[in-house]
Each structure stands twice: as C-alpha cells, then as structure tokens.
Amino acid sequence: MPKQKTHSGAKKRFKITGSGKVMKQQAGMRHNLEVKGSDRKRRLNADQVVPEVDAKFVRRMLGK
C-alpha cells in the first residue's frame, strides 16, 4: 500500500511541539487591526494549542 501524502495546507498551518501538542496561529490578525485594542492584538498574536479532539485529525494529515 502506498504511503499517505502530507496535507500541504496542514503543514503550513500547524506545528507539533516536542511534547506532541499541536500548535496553530490564532485567527484575527490579518486586517482591521486599527480597530482592535492592544490587549486584544497581543492575545491574538500568541500561538494556540489545538484541542486534542481536533489534534488527532491534524496529526493524521501531517503523517504523524
């Protein structure tokens, strides 16, 4: 049976930490930033841990 290909969109959006958690960039930092407060922008700029329910599918797309 052939190998499963890595999902090209997923490999650009997610990364797996050394402990196995799946990280993603929080949405909302692309445009209309002048109407968002600095506290909100700081919170949105941080990476976010993907919930374990979704991380299972992300790992499968990444071939892990």
From Swiss-Prot:
InterPro entries reported in the protein's UniProt record: Ribosomal_bL35 (IPR001706), Ribosomal_bL35-like (IPR021137), Ribosomal_bL35_CS (IPR018265), Ribosomal_bL35_sf (IPR037229)
GO cellular component annotations of the record: cytosolic large ribosomal subunit
MF (Gene Ontology): structural constituent of ribosome
Organism domain of life: Bacteria
Coiled coil, from the record: none
Pfam families documented for this protein: Ribosomal_L35p (PF01632)
Residue ranges of the TM segments: none
Key words, A-Z: Ribonucleoprotein, Ribosomal protein
GO biological process, alphabetically ordered: translation
Family note: Belongs to the bacterial ribosomal protein bL35 family.
NCBIfam families associated with the record: rpmI_bact
Name of the protein in its database record: Large ribosomal subunit protein bL35
